[in-house]
Amino acid sequence: MLAVWLMESKALSETAHPVGEGNLESILPENSSKAAGPMPVDTGGGRYHVQWDDSAPMTPLGQMVFFAQFLHAGGRWEDFCKDAPFGFTSPNAPSHEDVLGSLAFSILCGHTRYAHVNAVRFDAVSPAMLGMNKVVSEDSARRNLKKFDAMEARQWQRKHLRETWERLLCEPWMLDIDTTVKTVFGHQEGAEVGYNPHKPGRPSHAYHTYWIARLRLCLDVEVRPGKQSSSSYGMPALWELIDSLPVECRPQGIRGDCGYGSEANMLACEKRNIPYLFKLRQTVKIKNLISLMERQGGWVDCGQGFEGIEGEVRLSGWSRQRRVIIARRLVKKENPEATKNATPLLTHYGMLPVESESHEYIVLASTMPYGVDALVRLYRERGDAENPFDELKNQWGWAGFTTQDIDRCQVTARLIAQIYNWWSLYARLVDSERHREAVTTRPELLGGVGRQTKHAGQTQINISLTHSKSNSIKAKLAEASAFLQGLITTAEQLTNPQRWELILLRIFEKFIQPKLQNTGLPTLATG
């Protein structure tokens, strides 16, 4: 009886708590999750048979080989990695090329987080083009950036940024300065609530940047805490950069918005005999000057709907009178009362007297030796300096790659600027007509499936392009590659800086060789 009772209780205990569906593999078709052969996949276009292939050496960055050739021809990548102050001591530490190359691949692909490095982790073809052994993990990339001493990293990165653009400064050029804000989320060092027009009240970092106008090349970037967005925090690094340049390579002028139109910045420019063009805030004295000029008359046409006139003013805190340019244009403003009293029928057909004309004013302080119309045009063209901010933040990663400490944020900001400069120059070499943003150039000049094969000691890459302009892309790349290969094979006696100079001369031949006629404006500020 005891044995029977034990058997019945065991059966009851097994049925009281059913196991549900049990092991999922037991109800799936046999070996379906580990199928050795092709998997049938039904789609709207019919059935496809899919099979994984982890052994074929392939890359989604098929055209990376041409960019690697560009960096090698000028010695940019080798010198950059060789000088990196990592200070590795362990024999198991990754190479400089592995760490920097992993980040470079991620940046080139438009990633914004260290975790995105995993997307290129098992590329079996592209890493070798940059002398890499492997793509390191996200943790390794983030952790190894901590090996840098902040000052050593600053000197190393500024040196190589300078080597990228220094030869171009032998031509007359204009320098644009501006500040952008990077919103951060969390408890990062320097995450302070300061000026943040897009997300007020959010902590941020301030990026003080310096540009070669029109060429959209970044001279340098300084990352500061969120409350240090004022120009006074970014100008010391700029003066350090300018003072290190030979006099003949200094800018023909400096342009900045109203955040830079202070007495201190003007005095610093005047001390160095560098002309400036700064926008001024419309204080009471400036508004009185505008009223005086309106009564006085004598406005001249400056193009694009602008009119201009010049005068002199000495604001409170200024040491002397300075020349100012006042520009105005008509703008239409809505009349709320007219909109409120309008009939629905007139509203539907847009026949409303709801707009009145008034003037919008821009006041500029300048020591540049140009007329009113030229100065208004120069400042209007400064709007082009806003475009690189949008590109670097939304297409290159300036809005990401955030770490707890601000030093690594600074290193990655400069690294992104370096990769951006190299890629921009490469894109101009392939197509010198104009600057094109990464959202356009990546699909054209980086995408494509590359399949690598090796035979008889030769490595061959077969590239398949899916771009609609593939024929044009192939022709331009063939021309650029032939030029670079000629430098590598026939100019072996030249040093890396000399070869890089030849590359820059090829890219900017329309700026450097045929000088602008009948104008005194800086060559690299117009075009």
Language-model segments: which ranges?
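Short, conserved catalytic/metal-binding motifs centered on acidic residues
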Residues: 70, 102-103, 117, 137, ...
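Structural motif
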Residues: 58, 89-98, 354-355, 403-413
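Dynamic "connector" segments at or just before major functional cores
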Residues: 2-202, 208-247, 450-527
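Short amphipathic alpha-helical "interface-anchor" segments enriched in bulky aromatics
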Residues: 117, 181, 372-415, 419-426
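Short secondary-structure boundary/capping segments
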Residues: 189-194, 268-274, 291-297
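Domain-level cores of phosphate- or acyl-group-handling catalytic modules
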Residues: 228-285
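Basic, amphipathic alpha-helical segments enriched in Lys/Arg and hydrophobic/aromatic residues
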Residues: 399-462
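An anionic, glycine-rich sequence signature occurring as long contiguous blocks
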Residues: 8, 12-14, 19, 37-50, ...
